[in-house]
Amino acid sequence: AVSAGARKPRAAALEFARQVYRRESAHGAPIVLMGDSAGAGLALALAAGVRDAGERAARRLILLTPWVDVELPHPDAHAIEPTDPMLGRVGVLEAGRLYAGALPTSHPAISPARGNLQGLPAMTLFVAGRDILGPDALAFAEQARSSGCAVDVHFAQDMMHAWALLGFAESRKARAAMAAATLAAIGGLQ
């Protein structure tokens, strides 16, 4: 597993992810792209770039509390913010601006929900009700379905950002669902 997320500017993170993807793809083994938060947005942008380059697609995207639009356009984010124990709009918007670098924050490489979603791999999303990124993630799921993508959404109303990685009972269920989706995508244990 390799991780690259919001700690690197978009250009560096996406280029690093592309290099790793090409290297691993050359082996011919099935690939599942997974990311949490900014890493989920990066995985989505990578999948779109792979599609646009005509390269072999990943079998599935698994996106945990995905940050798919760094501008947080969904109006429900305002209502959720007081109940979100981890994220605030001001910080998220500033992180998005910094991550974008010289690109506009609306660019699909930065906010992949604004790009072409047709032809992307099947997706499994894990979305939390107490996460300001949740409304955009749910809207993205509907947009992806409308574009012809197969999308499964696991929604946890009382959970917060990154909940699937924590120690709650709901988290363990989410991790089991991630494992099942991964195994189904790659054809079981090799």
What are these regions (language model features)?
Residues 1-190:
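Alpha/beta-hydrolase superfamily serine-hydrolase fold, recognizing
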